[in-house]
Amino acid sequence: MIYAKELGTDMYSICPEGKLPVGFVEVTEEEYNEYLKNKEQERIAQLSMRRGDVFEAMLLAKNIGKPELRAMIEQAPLDDLTKALYLNRFDEAIDFYRSFPAFDMLGETLGITGAMLDRFFDTKDWHYLTTCKLTINATPDNAIVVINSEIVNEVTVPYGSVVDYTVSCDGYESKYDVFEITKDEVLEVVLDEDTANTEPIIPDEVETESTGEVNEE
């Protein structure tokens, strides 16, 4: 498998090894992946939603209405022309496009990341404007909790995130899980004692199955 680009165009392709089409040149995997990334960014930027649906989503996700959102733009540290353009589009647009810069500005204030906005416009699901908190209470108390590669017992992540956790402790069997989180979760994780390497205790005067000898201790 090789990666190829058509000369004079922005067309990229994946071709079988040794079968480069006429008019194409071979490119690196990194260049091909960058092309895919840019195409996805272009697609996301063109996503749109009806203004009423966006305002409704903000109410459901953040309990913030249109007047509050407009006030945030008015109070933003922008030059007069940029602020006027933002407010004009905010007031007059029939549809809102993901590429509208005011969304990233508002998102930063409201704790909504660019990735969360991308997912919201892509799915039209207001839940993707929210976050979920995962708390893990481990037993025994000295167990180590690792969530998404960090030693913590509590994290807050965007709705729909995939989280993984490990709970471990000397002398106990570790527990691991990975799942998609869509609501606040509190997990009670109780570790079982690790008996796999524990030497068996043989009572006095009991014949062992392995040797047939009597234990006299």
Which residue ranges define each predicted feature?
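Short, ordered, surface-exposed loop/turn motifs in non-cytosolic proteins
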Residues: T130, P140-E150
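Short proline/glycine-enriched turn/loop motifs at strand-loop junctions of beta-rich domains
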Residues: N137-A143, G160, Y172
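A short, solvent-exposed loop/turn motif at the edges and junctions
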Residues: V167-D177
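Exposed beta-strand and adjacent loop surfaces of beta-rich binding modules
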Residues: M1, K133, N142-I144, V162-D164
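Viral virion structural and adsorption modules
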Residues: K5-E6, C15-I136, E173, E180-E217
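Exposed beta-strand face motif in extracellular beta-rich ectodomains
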Residues: S161-Y165, E185-L187
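Short, solvent-exposed S/T- and G/P-enriched segments that are highly enriched in secreted/extracellular
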Residues: I147-Y159, Y176-D177, I181-K183
